[in-house]
Amino acid sequence: MQFIDQAIIDVKAGSGGDGISAFRREKYVPAGGPAGGDGGQGGNVVLEADDNLQTLLDFKFQKLISAENGQRGGPNKCTGASGKDTVLKVPCGTEVRHLSTNIILGDLTNKGQQLIVAFGGKGGFGNARYLSNSNRAPEKFTEGKVGEEWSLQLELKLLAEVGIIGLPNAGKSTLISVLSSARPKIADYPFTTLIPNLGVVRRPSGDGTVFADIPGLISGASKGIGLGHDFLRHIERTKVLLHLIDSASTDPINDFKTINEELTSYGHGLISRPRIFVLNKKELLNENEIKKLLNKIEKMTMKKVHIISAVTKFGLDDLLSSIWNELGY
């Protein structure tokens, strides 16, 4: 399935039904009064979070979404039927904004959570509403109100507790595939991963924690270079960042600095997010090389740096223990 995490849609709520002018015409009611009914309420356009959806693909070509109009009023003071609401299912983690003002209308993070994004118009009044002591036979009635119509920006931000970040080819996809049942595309060249991958990693209690492998972070990603800018939003909701460094790259220290710079430039508090630092690909270095690199990065981070091999699974148990501890599990 194609991964689409942004969409622009137009929504139009239903208009209210018109009220009517009518009078009682029963044979034995010679002074029949006004009996025109009110129009029905227009239907709303509603978004609902659905945890079975993972993409906004359904909205890529579905541009105008409308709800039903209310029905006009009837005689004998009968109110017209209300228009049906249109309920649209979106993935959990969908943020909704007004396109013109950029104002956030809501953030649908929980299964079943609903958000009315366009309210239906109110029904018009029938002439029965205007009966008074001074006017016993009013003919006045009103039309229904027009339903709201907006252009909306939908933006999906994945719901993961742990975000795996690092330069292309740092081993993020291999790590998430080893830790979970996720099966991302893996190969020995940059940008193998073109979309975020989610994997559920089991805690000792048996419960699952969602990890996200974020692709495409390179120098300048926060400014729109490469793929990273499109996907940095997916780590905004994470509680912990797993910063993966390729220990066998040409310049691991510079790689580390590059990711730091991108997190700082992007903002949204990512640089201050709890982070666990990991040197991957231990199997490609000798003990002396890995020790020197470890010392350099620990001096820069002032924190423990984990040494692992996602391929041989060395150090993964210790790494997971640190993750669970950071999450408070």
Curated annotation (Swiss-Prot):
Pfam families named in the record: GTP1_OBG, MMR_HSR1
Does the UniProt entry include the keyword Heme? Answer: no
Q: What highest taxon heads this organism's lineage?
A: Bacteria
Q: Name one GO cellular component term.
A: cytoplasm
Share an example GO biological-process annotation for this protein: ribosome biogenesis
Where would I find the Obg domain in this sequence?
A: 1-159
Q: What class of enzyme is it?
A: hydrolase
Keyword set, alphabetical order: ATP-binding, Cytoplasm, GTP-binding, Hydrolase, Magnesium, Metal-binding, Nucleotide-binding
Chief location of this protein within or outside the cell: cytoplasm
Cofactor section? Mg(2+)
The record's InterPro entries line, in alphabetical order, gives: G_OBG, GTP-bd, GTP-bd_Obg/CgtA, GTP1_OBG_dom, GTP1_OBG_dom_sf, OBG_GTPase, P-loop_NTPase
Give residues annotated as binding ATP: 166-173, 191-195, 213-216, 280-283, 309-311
Partners and quaternary state? Monomer.
Function, as annotated, reads:
An essential GTPase which binds GTP, GDP and possibly (p)ppGpp with moderate affinity, with high nucleotide exchange rates and a fairly low GTP hydrolysis rate. Plays a role in control of the cell cycle, stress response, ribosome biogenesis and in those bacteria that undergo differentiation, in morphogenesis control.
Q: Which HAMAP family match?
A: GTPase_Obg
Q: What is this protein called?
A: GTPase Obg
- The gene name on file is obg
